[in-house]
From Swiss-Prot:
It comes from the Eukaryota. GO terms for cellular component: mitochondrial [2Fe-2S] assembly complex; mitochondrial matrix; mitochondrion. Pfam families: Frataxin_Cyay. Keywords: Heme biosynthesis, Ion transport, Iron, Iron storage, Iron transport, Mitochondrion, Oxidoreductase, Transit peptide, Transport. Gene3D superfamilies: Frataxin/CyaY. GO terms for biological process: [2Fe-2S] cluster assembly; heme biosynthetic process; intracellular iron ion homeostasis; iron ion transport; iron-sulfur cluster assembly. This is Frataxin homolog, mitochondrial. PANTHER family: FRATAXIN (PTHR16821), FRATAXIN, MITOCHONDRIAL (PTHR16821:SF2). Its EC number is 1.16.3.1. SMART domains: Frataxin_Cyay. It is found in: Mitochondrion.
Length: 158
């Protein structure tokens, strides 16, 4: 907060740095995202951009899929970086951002919990435990359930 006050006193435009403004019950909140890379990893700003783009693409794909299937007990909710996909008797998927770890976490009724980190080299979310990718595991599981190929496309922004 000190640096924000100092910027106002100096009349320095604070928008030269990557800030995110949001409102909550207590008023305006300002969050600064680091632009420093550590060991070739994503910066905070890059992580949020890529993770949000990924979740947006997944949400759009899930909505299209649920619209095609048309089952009333299937539902999707997407808010605050969390996708909750309820598939009735098949179970519930939860896909969410984990900003402190720069990861996306997947909770699947088929494969269980998994953590994914973004690879700058392959431009995809790779599992921290095996060779799988987020889009690959989702494609595999949904293709089996719906008995047809389901493809999750990457965002052009990646």
């Amino acid at each position: 907060m000190q640096s924000l006050r100092a910027a106002f006193r100096r009349r320095t435009p604070i928008f030269l740095k990557p800030y995110e403004f949001s409102t909550n019950v207590f008023g305006l909140r300002c969050r600064y995202y680091s632009q420093v890379r550590h060991n070739g990893a994503l910066t905070d700003l890059e992580y949020h951009r890529v993770a949000d783009d990924t979740l947006d693409v997944l949400n759009d794909t899930f909505e299209d899929l649920l619209e095609e299937v048309g089952k009333k007990d299937y539902d999707i909710q997407y808010a605050n970086g969390v996708i909750t996909l309820m598939l009735g008797e098949k179970g519930t998927y939860v896909i969410n951002k984990q900003p402190p770890a720069h990861q996306i976490w997947l909770s699947s009724p088929v494969s269980g919990p998994k953590h994914y980190e973004y690879s700058l080299k392959s431009k995809t979310w790779c599992s921290t435990r095996d060779e799988g990718t987020l889009l690959g595991i989702l494609s595999s599981e949904f293709s089996k359930w719906f008995s047809r190929p389901i493809e999750f496309k990457k965002s052009e922004d990646f």
